[in-house]
Amino acid sequence: MKSYKTLIFIIVVIVLLAAVCLFFPSDGVPFLGRRLFFPTLKEVLSPEKSVSVDEKMRALEESIKMQAITDSINTARETARQDSIRFYKKFFTTHSARFYLPADDYSFFDTLFEAMEQCKTDSSIVHILHYGDSQIEEDRISSYIRQRLQKQFGGMGAGLLPVMQPIPSASVGQSASGAMERYIIAGMHQNRAPSNRYGILGQFAIMSGNGSISIRSQNYSRTQDNVKKWNVVRLFVGTNTTPLSATLISGKYSKTKSIDAPNSSPTALTWYLPSPTKQITINLTGNAELSAVSLDGHYGVNVDNIPIRGSSGTFFSQIDGNSISLTAKTLNVRLVMLEFGGNMMPSITQNNIQNYMDILARQINYFHKICPQAKVILIGPADMSTKIRGNLQT
């Protein structure tokens, strides 16, 4: 038989079977005491899939196992969380190395962490001021805290920097040139200014004419990653007796900000760079008090390293609060860490201890007044060990 005849035969058979499927009664027909059934077109074209009971049971068992694993993980996490809560409750109330919190209130820092957690969703920033003596120079301690917090909550850059920086840092390199003079309220390099407008860093520079500030990221092995770039730059100006012009240059980017008239109130000039950078120069013209420069990201947390060599932290209440308030508000300062006491140790007596405590209490109250949203931590001098007959003792 020729192939086309075979094809015609197959088509005829299919058509006949389809006709039978279409017209055969759905309830069948009786035949010799039995009932004959024939599938409908729907049953032929869309047959019901058979279900394997074994496959169903295996899938159910897998689902039960996965749910058991998930429940076990959730239970372990909740147990770990409860264990952590119990540990820190005990730590904050009984441990010898604990944070001494007001009324042992372990929720004392909740508002701080809430603010840091909101940084990403609100595109906001939070700053932590870390004041100290020479123990925190070169961005020691601050850099570690900054890196951990920026990894958790976002952020970049080194935070607040003085306009004129005589102390080297592991995070950024700085230079300043032109008609500038540096004033600092306390410490070994104390140079008192004609006013008490020392600003948030306890130091500022007076510029008369032209000046330039250059900042670049460092690349030492101990330089933390997040500090190497920034894309928001702020220049905090205390007062200016003439119009002030400030041009920020970074690669091909160049933009000028200005204060058009003399101003006796603090001002912040802000540049939002199109992309993160590692180096900037700010060229200035005018007569002004320059309080600080800050390097940040568009959102996140920053820790400001503010060392004052030779200081015991007793000077803050001498600073004009207005020279601090604008900077603290602009940067959303939520925590102030005061790490002092080492320079008092050589001359300490019981009477001196009480006097020093009273002075530090005034400094804490001062920060509560000018930074009402900020918590304050006082970190005292560490107990340093020494070798006695070959053994380390305190």
Q: Positions of the model-derived regions?
A:
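Short, charged N-terminal helix-start/capping segments
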Residues: S52-R58, E62, P262-P276, D383-T386, ...
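N-terminal regions that are enriched for targeting/export leaders
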Residues: R86-P102, Y106
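Hydrophobic, well-ordered secondary-structure segments
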Residues: K49-M57, E78, Q82, E114-T121
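Coil residues (strongly favoring Ser/Thr
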Residues: D71-S72, D83-S84, S96, T111, ...
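Extracytoplasmic/periplasmic/luminal assembly and interaction segments
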Residues: R58-F87
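Alpha-helical cap/lid subdomain in secreted, periplasmic
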Residues: M1-M57, S195-R234, G238-S254, D296-T394
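Serine-esterase "nucleophile elbow" of acetyl-processing enzymes
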Residues: F99-Y183, G187, S212, N219-R309, ...
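Charged heptad-repeat coiled-coil "rod" segments that mediate homo-/hetero-oligomerization
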Residues: A186-S195
